[in-house]
Amino acid sequence: MFAMNDIKGQVAVVSGSTSGIGLALARAVAQCGGDVVLNGLGDPAVIEQTRADLAAETGVRVLYHPADMTQPDQIADMVATAHRELGRLDILVNNAGIQHVEAVENFPADAWEKIISINLSSTFYATKAAIPIMKAHGRGRIVNIASAHGLVASPFKSAYVAAKHGVIGFTKTVALELAQQNITCNAICPGFVETPIVAKQIEDQARTRGMTPDDVMKNIILGSQPTKRFVTTDELAGLFLYLVSDLGASANGSHFSVDGGWTAQ
């Protein structure tokens, strides 16, 4: 009853999955026997090696689509390619995200627009493209990777906080619209996870706050989480697999915190 065998043979599209959280979730699907479409930035040779390694390790089909998450047409093509090449689409993970750290009065307008586009609007465009396919199939699972910053705020992250709050609101709306279609939509709200985006944040926070990187790590990054450690990608993957399995059918329109107690404070 509690095996994840129902994921075998399914198809997942995971945006922002060439590293970090996205890659961990894509790997979790593949390890359960599901086919995967990767997407994200990076060196093309490294991305191809990642794709080939994941396919070889798990024996499933793994594709890569280079969709730019600021371009609605490319996002729609990514979803359509998964359906066309792999025959179906069962799981959509909206994970792509970027960050910029700056006070509101100095926040560059182009950085604001890009963060809203990638962190929020891409979630809308991918979901819009996926819904008709999932409806036709009679089942679907949409998981949006929000953040603890979708529930609380921190200084110098206005665009990121606004986008992630928006993701949670969008998640609830989609869940209500599709509640009788056997399609669920949920959000996972991680705390700080040791990923490339967090590594860059440490440098940016040090600059903005006039602190050393070590002090940022101790007092700002891990200081937010009562456990005083990073959330692991395996911990996120465990929750994710539940949400996309048949056992997660009644989890809908919810946000799930995995933040070491950060948002309990």
Task: Give the positions of each predicted feature.
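Short C-terminal tail/terminal secondary-structure segment
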Residues: 2-6, 21, 151-152, 229, ...
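Conserved glycine-rich cofactor-binding loop
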Residues: 11, 18-19
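Conserved glycine-rich Rossmann-like NAD(P)H-binding loop of the short-chain dehydrogenase/reductase
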Residues: 32-49
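Substrate-binding pocket helix/loop in short-chain dehydrogenase/reductase
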Residues: 103-104, 108-116, 142, 221
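Active-site helix of classical SDR
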Residues: 127, 163, 171
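Residue(s) in the substrate-gating loop at a strand-loop-helix junction
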Residues: 147
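Short, small/polar-rich loop/turn modules that mediate ligand/substrate recognition or access, typified
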Residues: 179, 184, 251-253
